Each structure stands twice: as C-alpha cells, then as structure tokens.
A protein has these predicted regions:
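Short glycine-rich anion-binding loops that position phosphate/pyrophosphate groups of nucleotides
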Residues: 26, 260-263, 285-288
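Short, glycine/polar-rich helix-capping loops at beta-to-alpha or helix-loop-helix junctions
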Residues: 221-226, 264-265
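Redox-cofactor binding/interface segments in oxidoreductases and associated redox assembly factors
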Residues: 237, 257-258, 282
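Rossmann-fold NAD(P) dinucleotide-binding segment
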Residues: 263-277
Length: 325
C-alpha cells in the first residue's frame, strides 16, 4: 500500500469513490506476494497490481461491486496452467484477494507511519472487514466485535513484522473459525547520505526507485542545492553530529558517507558506528579505508564498532562516472 500513497491522493482529488484489493494468499508461482495492493475507482481507473493480466481486470470489477454493496469480500482467483503465463503465474495456481469498498483510515496511517506496524483484518468469518492496528511495541489499537485472543494476535503480528512478510491465519473462536490477514508495514527504510557531491546526486534517484526515503545532509550550503536533488525526501544543512541528531538514527537507517573529507567523515562515523543503524558505509579506496580505521581507533572506537564499517562502497565496474560508482 505504501507504493500507492500518491495514487491514493490522486484518487481522492477526483471525488470519485474508490476501493482497495490486497493479496492475502498465493499458491503456486506468482509475481506479486501477499500484501500487494491495488486501488480502483467506481468508474474503472486503477493503480497498483495484485498479479497481472486478467486478474487485474477481474479484481477491478470486484472492487466496483464492493463499492456498490458497501461490504468487503474475499475473492479466489484460480488459474489453469494453460492461462498461467497470461496472468503472470508461471505454474498456474490460486490467488486470494480481499476486496474492500474503501481504504480504512487506520490502514492509511499504517502506510504513512515511520515505525513498524501491522494491520490485522478479519477477511473471513464473524466481523468481516473489521481491523485493528498492532504497533511494533505490541500495543493494539482498535477492537474486534468478536472475542479473539489478542495476546496471540499481538505475538503473531510481531513475528510477521520481524519477517517483514504479510500472512494470513485461521483463529478458532466460540462462534466458529475466523481468518485474519496480517498486513505488514515495516519501518520505512531511510538512506542517509552525508556529503552532497556528484555521487550523492546520482545515488538519490536510484535509492528512491528502490523505495528508500532519502535524506541528504551537508554542512556546506553551496553543495546542498535543491535543484541538484529534486527527488530527495529531505535536505539537511548541518554538520554530522547535528544532522544525525535531527534525523534520529534507528535500525531502519542506511548511512552512506560520501564527503571524501576526513574532517567530515570521521565525526560522522563516530556517531554512526555507535548508532543502531542497519548499515554504515564510507566511500574511499582500500588504502583510504585502512588509514580511516586507524584514525577511528585513535578516536576511541572499539574493534567491534569499527568492524561495522563497510568500505570501499560502490560497485567495482571499472567506471569513473558518479552513476557508475
């Protein structure tokens, strides 16, 4: 759903009602995993994908029907081997898609949120369409009309969040079986770049295309020009310590130091290598990396902390241009 937020705003602006479909189960080979979403308006416009080929057309019709009746529905699409290639299922199979007449506000908040969250929805059984939101702390926001094991739901949501994989499961209640769909929204990955040079300008659009929220920081105003970084999520004019403090480094941060200047890189590394960031890398040759590590030891960093540093970074393609690096 996160990749459809711009389309969501576009559809809202039309004033036309629109609904959503999300893949809840896949059997066989499929190009779109559980959690893949699609939006469709009442007049047939679509955004996103749940599979390919005729499944999209059929799903759009199901969304239109859900809008008309104002109720959700779990739909099963079975694909024969003969039609498999047409819809992108290399070996045939079955797809289950949950169709809703509108996008829930909680779902939108989860998709927009920076912290990890899981939407848990009833896709079959009593309470069809009801949902709660489970935060990465395990706290549950919202409630179901039927008594469900909330502790077990919180635990299952946490496990799905750690795997970063949406999934469905059946839960037995006093009134019968209920099928829940755990739609995972991991922490939004952030690429933090310090050093707004040519390589940074080439890296930002690539990272954005891969789904990263990009942040470019530099203490030199002349380099931090918005025209050079039209696709950057944020530009921060600050030196490393201040920039990282403002960003709030966490386990969803991937840090690339591209300044090529020890007086900027080393203070930044001292903070970054002691942070919970998932990745810390610095540009520079193998020779530069050796001397850099020695200076980091002199600054008091431990071998374990220094061992987190990736370098040289970039691809050794034999190229010289920023985009090639």
């Amino acid at each position: 759903m996160r990749d459809l937020l711009i389309d969501y705003e576009r559809f809202v602006a039309t004033g036309k009602p629109f609904g959503r479909a999300v893949v809840t189960s896949v059997w066989g080979s499929a190009p779109r995993p559980e959690g893949s979403s699609m939006l469709a308006t009442s007049d047939g416009r679509i955004a996103g994908s749940v599979s390919g080929g005729c499944v999209e057309s059929a799903t759009a019709l199901e969304i239109e029907a859900a809008i008309q009746r104002k109720t959700p529905k779990l739909v099963t699409f079975g694909v024969s081997d003969e039609r498999a290639w047409e819809v992108g299922l290399a070996c045939g199979g079955t797809i289950k898609v949950f169709v809703e007449p509108a996008v829930k506000p909680q779902l939108l908040e989860a998709a927009q949120g920076k912290t990890g969250q899981v939407m848990v929805s009833v896709i079959a059984g009593t309470g069809l369409g009801e949902a709660v939101r489970v935060l990465e702390t395990g706290e549950i926001e919202g409630q179901f009309s039927v008594a469900l094991p909330l502790d077990a739901i919180s635990e299952a949501a946490g496990a799905a969040l750690r795997r970063e994989a949406s999934t469905s499961r059946d839960v037995e209640t006093s009134t019968g079986s209920v099928t829940l769909f755990f739609e995972v929204f991991p922490r939004h990955p952030r690429l933090v770049i310090f050093g707004a040079g040519q390589i940074a300008a080439a890296l930002v659009p690539l990272a954005k295309a891969l789904g990263y929220h990009t942040i470019v920081a530099d203490g030199r105003k002349v380099f931090l020009d918005a025209e050079r970084f039209p696709t950057a999520g944020e530009l921060i004019l600050a030196w490393p310590e201040e920039a990282f403090e403002r960003i709030g480094l966490d386990s969803a941060c991937y840090i690339c130091l591209l300044s090529h200047d020890p007086k900027f890189d080393e203070p930044a590394l001292k903070v970054a290598l002691r942070s919970p960031a998932a990745y810390v890398g610095a540009i520079g040759s193998k020779k530069t990396q050796v001397s850099r590590r020695e200076r980091l030891r002199e600054l008091g960093l431990s071998d374990e902390e220094i061992g987190r540093l990736h370098g040289p970074i970039g691809l050794n393609l034999g190229g010289r241009q920023p985009a090639e690096t």
